[in-house]
Amino acid sequence: MMKIIYAFLLIAVVAFMGSGIMAEPLAEAIAADKPGQAKEIGIFDRITELINWLVNH
């Protein structure tokens, strides 16, 4: 039950970050971590990463 609550909270945070307030600095930070593979981060990519993390833990 707690995993479900945490999942919804994390999705809310990811949605807030993806709304444009944090999207640009976050995209630049990830692009800096992966030279030559700069990509724009979409909200669905973040949700997919969250779901994969929840499944693996």
UniProtKB/Swiss-Prot annotation:
Q: Does the keyword Iron apply?
A: no
What does the protein in this record do?
A: Probable neurotoxin.
Q: What name has this protein been given in UniProt?
A: Myrmicitoxin(1)-Pm7a
Q: List the GO cellular component terms.
A: extracellular region
Q: Lineage of this protein's species?
A: Eukaryota, Metazoa, Ecdysozoa, Arthropoda, Hexapoda
Q: Which UniProt keywords apply?
A: Neurotoxin, Secreted, Signal, Toxin
Q: Please list the GO terms describing molecular function.
A: toxin activity
Please list which residues make up the signal peptide: 1-23
**Annotated tissue distribution:** Expressed by the venom gland.
Q: Which domain of life is it from?
A: Eukaryota
Location(s) in or outside the cell: Secreted
Query: Propeptide residue ranges?
Result: 24-31
Residues annotated as coiled-coil are: none
Q: What is its main location?
A: secreted
Q: Which family does it belong to?
A: Belongs to the formicidae venom clade 4 family.
